Amino acid sequence: KKLSAKHILRITGDCPLIDPRLVDKILKIYKENNFDYVSNIQRRSFPDGMDIEVFSFKKLQEANKILISKSDREHVTKYFLRSDKIKKYNFFQRKDYSNIRITLDTKYDFQLIDKIFNNFNNFYFSLDDIIEFYHKNTLLFDRYKKLSEQINFQKLDKGQQIWQEAKNFIAGGNMLFSKR
């Protein structure tokens, strides 16, 4: 508001490997069309850690007037995703790489990202370069992903742990709660 911004590009701090070319593609779609919200997270196809969102400041102001939950205020784009009043577009790629984890939430994520940086001779590498590195080192990526998921799982409260376990055995995990 202070800067009279009309549009907001949201890239969170846990996504240090963002590919500027991907940002440019998403911005181009946003600029050339009449969308309120464009992202690559509605239907995941990019690695976790390549999360990009663009939305209008006007829609953010409108959301601010109606949002009351603490969760919505903290993660305002969740409202954009579920609202039918928001004209949205999801940018995705045909090849699904959503199983690749290159986000920075745990010390293991940091260790993997450090290995990615050390693999390249300079800081100018793309998502394609990371994916090529992934294909040559899938066991490395999978090991760090598993370690990070174990830490994140330990942080969940008991109810969330039960639901998470149920999802592995029951389609959707929701039947667990209908039986209680």
Question: Model-predicted segments: where are they?
Answer:
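Conserved N-terminal catalytic core of the sugar/cofactor nucleotidyltransferase
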Residues: K1-L3
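Conserved nucleotide-sugar donor-binding
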Residues: A5, I52-N64, K107-Q111
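Short aromatic/hydrophobic "clamp" motif used to bind/position activated sugar donors
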Residues: I8-L9
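Conserved donor-nucleotide/metal-binding helix-loop-beta segment in metal-dependent transferases, i.e.
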Residues: C15-S45
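Basic phosphate/pyrophosphate-binding loop/patch that engages nucleotide-derived ligands
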Residues: K25-D36, S56-D72, Y79-R82, Q160, ...
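A recurrent flexible, glycine/aromatic-enriched loop bordering the glycosyltransferase active site
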Residues: I41-I52, K95-D96
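Conserved alpha/beta core of the MobA/IspD/sugar-nucleotide pyrophosphorylase nucleotidyltransferase superfamily
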Residues: F55, V76-Q154
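N-terminal glycine-rich, Lys/His-bearing helix-loop that initiates the first secondary-structure elements
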Residues: Q154-R180
